[in-house]
Amino acid sequence: MSHEAVWQHVLEHIRRSITEVEFHTWFERIRPLGIRDGVLELAVPTSFALDWIRRHYAGLIQEALGLLGAQAPRFELRVVPGVVVQEDIFQAAPAEAPRPKLNPKYTFENFVVGPNNSMAHAAAVAVAESPGRAYNPLFIYGGVGLGKTHLMHAVGHSVAKRFPHLRIEYVSTETFTNELINAIREDRMTEFRERYRSVDLLLVDDVQFIAGKERTQEEFFHTFNALYEAHKQIILSSDRPPKDILTLEARLRSRFEWGLITDIQPPDLETRIAILKMNAEQRGLRIPEDALEYIARQVTSNIRELEGALMRAIAFASLNGVELTRAVAAKALSDIFAPRELEADPLEIIRKVADHFGLKPEELTGSGRKKEVVLPRQLAMYLVRELTRASLPEIGQLFGGRDHTTVLYAIQKVQELAESDREVQGLLRTLREACT
């Protein structure tokens, strides 16, 4: 991780811990110079600023570095007169703007497509190519951090590039509600309606928060109608489908269901690894496959947390001057994932089982059907299923590309044996202890 990226993460932590006035006064003009021998070097504009920051914020900076994995968090301040802010440092934590903008990082080019999101991606691409005609509205739902906002912004970028004359508006439901309240209070409803009803593409994030807000629903209902009747594109995101949004007016629910409803599921292992690879490549880093797989196995449901875990591991390695290996990744994430929660390595399970029976791992994963291999292979499949988050198809791939039904049969067979055979019970107990 570059020193700029390390400082960016430090700033994000600091910003959450102090007031905006403090942040703008003391931190906006600090520039990271580099990392030398594990020490983050920072440039400040004056000796007064250096002294003030050292006396009042040193502990906070060290705390932020510690959260990134620095074993002995250290930084050094240096006066560099006329130091200027590098804007990219603050992109991840911008000051509040009067209008939200599309995130330049969220494009189709860096959206990793997998079985969990392929339909949503295809629909988003279709809408970007022909707004107002393909699917209107497009309703994307799924859990937090799975890529809904990424897809919405990607559509916005694509439409802006293809049709530069079109007006695009991205807004969260919370912002829409707050702006509506202010417009009512300040008697600016005509201006408010003009803004949202004159766009060609309206992107509304977290629309589930509109539920229960009568005036907001009323206004959004008329905004929706105006845009839809004018053949303008509407894209909505939510953490649940329309039918599950309680206290949502029936007339809005029915309109949300007029177009295409598509979901995004948590990514599978291969997709998670691909996401991590892309993130690493974008930073010009080459990270060993087993380190990426380790991280991918620890974070299974949330892409935002997955990327955060990667950044933590990269920062940990950078701050401690070591290469990012599987072992380093495990150490970097050890205080996030308690030891009992850390997932066993499937390949290590296979090796342990093979060793116990005096076999080679390739014999368990190969196609051989010798009697002395069958039970150990079934036990290994059972333990991989029990001790990891691997799905049946993923386990099948580990064992020579076997079908998931074969894996299921092996697991059920071991369960049956364990219920009636004390020797198998003891064997499982021994192997389980060896693998965890």
From Swiss-Prot:
Source organism phylogeny: Bacteria, Thermotogati, Deinococcota, Deinococci, Thermales
Family as reported in the entry's similarity comment: Belongs to the DnaA family.
This protein's domain notes: Domain I is involved in oligomerization and binding regulators, domain II is flexibile and of varying length in different bacteria, domain III forms the AAA+ region, while domain IV binds dsDNA.
Enzyme Commission numbers on file: 3.6.4.-
UniProt binding sites for ATP: 145, 147-149
Matches recorded under PANTHER family: CHROMOSOMAL REPLICATION INITIATOR PROTEIN DNAA
Alphabetical list of InterPro entries matching this protein: AAA+_ATPase (IPR003593), Chromosome_initiator_DnaA (IPR001957), Chromosome_initiator_DnaA-like (IPR020591), Chromosome_initiator_DnaA_CS (IPR018312), DnaA_C (IPR013159), DnaA_dom (IPR013317), DnaA_N_dom (IPR024633), DnaA_N_sf (IPR038454)
Residues covered by region (Domain IV, binds dsDNA): 318-436
Gene Ontology molecular function terms on file: ATP binding; ATP hydrolysis activity; DNA replication origin binding; lipid binding
GO biological process per UniProt: DNA replication initiation; regulation of DNA replication
Record keywords: ATP-binding, Cytoplasm, DNA replication, DNA-binding, Hydrolase, Lipid-binding, Nucleotide-binding
Temperature effects on activity: Optimum temperature is greater than 60 degrees Celsius, at higher temperatures in vitro DNA-binding became unstable.
SMART domains tied to this protein: AAA (SM00382), Bac_DnaA_C (SM00760)
Location in or out of the cell: Cytoplasm
Positions of region (Domain II): 80-100
Protein name (database record): Chromosomal replication initiator protein DnaA
Complex and partners: Oligomerizes as a right-handed, spiral filament on DNA at oriC.
